[in-house]
Amino acid sequence: MDWDNVAAEDVIEALREVEWSTPPRSFGEFFSRFAFPRSFSKWKSRLKCNLYYYRTNYFILVIFVLGLALVTRPLALVGAALTALSIAFLNDSFAASFNEKFIRTIRHFSPHMAAKMRPPHMPVIRGRSTARKTVYVCGKPRWVFVITFLTASLVMWFSSCGLLWVLYALLTSLAVIIVHASIRTPNLKARLNTFREEFRAVWRNYSEL
């Protein structure tokens, strides 16, 4: 895949739609080979490739740094967990998987309530849903939960006076991620994984026709 021709918006869209259930890459692979890029275009290509390939490792890194920064502030730590959950809801596969598991659990106690949590019926025109991009969680659009969790986390951060620590932790983790993604040399496994994800995306679009 030619990452030079991939825009930042395309990377964000791919991260939103890709499966996040895959385990993180091993430490041996994560810290394997490092080298500085030879040009600005090479740096941009490597940065986008590594952000996509090591996405799970970077997400765990952010959670770990936030946990260290807020270990003495339990309320702010809960706020950070809510923020991580709201960010995870932005991913299609996570939101759909969470919705199914939560409704399945509720069904054991109240089938009637679980039925109400099902997403509304989407009209289909020529084999395609008119709202294919709309993802529902417990019968509500996922942005409702994203905004609710983000608001609750901000309230907890202000209440615990941990907002400054959160900013420090986020900036630190962001700096570490950018440095690692910039100097980590993409290996053959990363390129093969990219081709596999491309094939899955094409096959998914074909199956929806």
Swiss-Prot record:
Transmembrane regions: 51-72, 76-98, 142-162, 163-183
Primary residence: membrane
UniProt membrane topology term: Multi-pass membrane protein
Compartment(s) of residence: Endosome membrane
Pfam family, any one: PRA1
Coiled-coil blocks: none
Keywords for this protein: Endosome, Membrane, Transmembrane, Transmembrane helix, Transport
GO biological process terms held by the UniProt record: vesicle-mediated transport
InterPro entries, alphabetized: Prenylated_rab_accept_PRA1 (IPR004895)
Superkingdom of origin organism: Eukaryota
Gene Ontology cellular component annotations, sorted alphabetically: endoplasmic reticulum; endosome membrane
Family per record: Belongs to the PRA1 family.
Function noted in UniProt: May be involved in both secretory and endocytic intracellular trafficking in the endosomal/prevacuolar compartments.
Protein name as annotated: PRA1 family protein A2
